[in-house]
Amino acid sequence: MRHASVDDIPVLAHHRVAMFRDMGQLAPELKDALQRATASYLDDALPRGEYLAWIAEDSGKPPTAIGGAGVQLRPILPRPRTAADLELGPEAIVLNVYVEPAWRRRGVAETLMRTVLDALASRGIQRIVLHASDAGRRLYERLGFVLTNEMRLGR
């Protein structure tokens, strides 16, 4: 497991495309456009620290990326977390948790997520959200994520 750099943008973009493809949410004709748009976003966001990413690799020589995960950081207004405590920003949005099919069901996603959560805790980030796929929901629940009342405008 290692922290990703701008040199890893092609792998990170590939994982994002593969994730949406595997969930059945990507029309084949959008694959190249999503790959380019993702790479363009990461080219700006990674150096600015607005997006953090990790790569899981096999033990080959040279190692091959077998999975990855990312976090988009966004500022939030301070708000009460409890009656006696404030929740300060930024908010971390976990994105693009992806494991290559041949490596699934071997604990790679859990290791990625524990790495992400440890890194965010070390930065003092209190609010962590994600959108769970059906395949990932049990893992996220085991890690302590709970359903919320968040809603989205359906346009």
Stretch-by-stretch model annotation:
Residues 81-101, 153:
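Conserved acetyl-CoA binding element of GNAT-fold acetyltransferases
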Residues 103-115:
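Conserved acetyl-CoA pyrophosphate-binding loop and the N-cap/start of the following alpha-helix
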